[in-house]
């Protein structure tokens, strides 16, 4: 039941939104073993003039960038799975975004089961009340 928050540099593009969402959903399902029907992905766009890396805007550098944050229940994935996920997501972004800046971050956020949930129930509650 992960939720992903994604920032992409550039103008809003429905095709890019769909491609990035599909890539993230596939990586999340295949590598982190999360159920696609419980995966939510929110994608927002930021103009390159307003995204600063190393003191210069992406527009000035002629680069694109992305930031991907995924919240998952703590202790549900290994370090190796999370490392593989970060690698796969970065490689997926490289294929979809021209001139991707090296400093495009992917953050896997392990959230305590008692502090995270959906539908009004925590993951801890779900684990003990199937």
Sequence positions of predicted segments:
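A domain-level signal for the structural core that forms small-molecule/cofactor-binding pockets
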Residues: 1-130
